[in-house]
Amino acid sequence: GQHGFENIGIAGHPEGSPDITQETINEFLLKKFELSQSQNLNLELVTQFFFDAGPFIKWCANLVQKNINLPVRVGFPGPASFKTLLNFGMMSGVGNSLNFLKKNSTKVTDLLTKTSNDEMLSQLADYSLEESPLKAFHCFPFGGFEKTCYWLNEIQSGEFTIENQKIKLHKKVF
């Protein structure tokens, strides 16, 4: 554009926000979308991290239903200890995902032992193959930048297998 900006990312709230009502979120998202259309802006929705793909997929379906045709860049927690993920989750207010973890003790056990949410990544990858607004993702390197980069490089280079919806790197991250 005129000032050197090619794309604009705005906050997407698949799990709502503790500070803003859902009605207000929806109202302003629609206004931003309409403005982007009238001004021919490349707008994308960028989400917070979460631990459960279900509410995110439902949120995307709601966007499609309302004809809010914006690409979505999903926030994904990189490999980290369960304690670290829980602490960041509590600070960030990703409440629905934290409740999901509390109710699904096997997921908690998985996170305690392998420190990455492979099942959710598999669900998001499957969903991105459909006619969905999910176009990209970005990582939150809570467990450290180096570990997250290594993990991403192993996935990008194909150095993994998928067993029972879980990604197994050929080499350990830690």
Annotate each language-model stretch with its function:
Residues 35-44, 54-57, 63-67:
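Hydrophobic secondary-structure block in the mid-to-C-terminal portion of proteins
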Residues 14-18, 42-48:
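Surface-exposed cleft-lining segments at the edges of enzyme active sites
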Residues 1-34, 64-129, 142-145, 155-174:
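Active-site pocket-lining/capping segments in soluble small-molecule metabolic enzymes
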Residues 37-45, 129-136:
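Short, surface-exposed connector motifs at secondary-structure boundaries
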Residues 59-60, 152-155:
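Short Gly/Thr/Asp-enriched flexible loops that form oxyanion-binding sites at enzyme active sites
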Residues 20, 47-62, 142-147:
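Active-site glycine- and acidic-residue-rich loops that bind
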Residues 136-142:
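C-terminal structured interaction module
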Residues 44-52, 74, 137:
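Conserved strand-turn element in the central/C-terminal portion of the radical SAM core barrel
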